[in-house]
Amino acid sequence: MRIKDKIKRPRRPVVVYEILPPREKDGTLNSYAANISSLLSQTHIDAINIPEVRDEVARGERPVKNQVRAEPREFGKLLQDIVGIESIVNRVVVHQKLEEEIIWFEETYNKYEI
């Protein structure tokens, strides 16, 4: 059953976990996803929320430099394929023009199947 159907017609509480995309220093996407997969197989999860991590400049300089992270859609697609749990990419939409967001949504749906 798809996550949208689970939300519309819940038979039990819907569980969504948030997992940050791996940092470049964490190794390959495949190895990171394999580790996550073994953890997720031990519990019941309906979907995985993957946030888009951005530097926040509004509050001034960060004490710790933000690490470059994997593309959330690539990571989400990989987790869907390996774990079989739907991914939700939590995108920060205020940074782009509407036309660019429409292209992003179409690409996310068609290329990454999210």
For each feature predicted by the language model, list its residue ranges:
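Active-site beta->alpha loop and helix N-cap motifs at the rims of alpha/beta catalytic domains
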Residues: 1-114
